[in-house]
């Protein structure tokens, strides 16, 4: 039986930190679903369709990754995808409390759904999509933090 995992997020936009996590997840699980949340309340810069397209392009080198947009409750989405593992990245201790709350709620809603926490590689441990966008808005060089296709799309959005 294939072990299916979901790595959810808004990915607005997907960064090299996200790519680091999903790449390592592909080595742990047979199939990884990069689940891109619609998250309208976060007022994303990129549409859901754009974020899905950018993530698909950025993960083409990973044969066991499927990129899917979703707007459902995570536990319901996981059940529909036949996934039993939820991957979450933890950048700092500050992330842990919120992630623990989510993990407990997801387990309440779907007892067979395990949350697995991965720390990003040191190189990416301090970045977030929000930080990258903010630096780019002020003409800072964010090339190092984004896949090339994402960097081009971000620069086009900010032009």
From Swiss-Prot:
Its cofactor is Mg(2+). CDD domains: PPAT. One of its GO terms (biological process) is coenzyme A biosynthetic process. Substrate binds at residues 10, 42, 74, 88. InterPro entries: Cyt_trans-like, PPAT, Rossmann-like_a/b/a_fold. Coiled coil: none annotated. Pathway: Cofactor biosynthesis; coenzyme A biosynthesis; CoA from (R)-pantothenate: step 4/5. The keyword Nucleotide-binding applies. NCBIfam families: coaD_prev_kdtB (TIGR01510), cyt_tran_rel (TIGR00125). This is Phosphopantetheine adenylyltransferase. It comes from Escherichia coli O7:K1 (strain IAI39 / ExPEC).
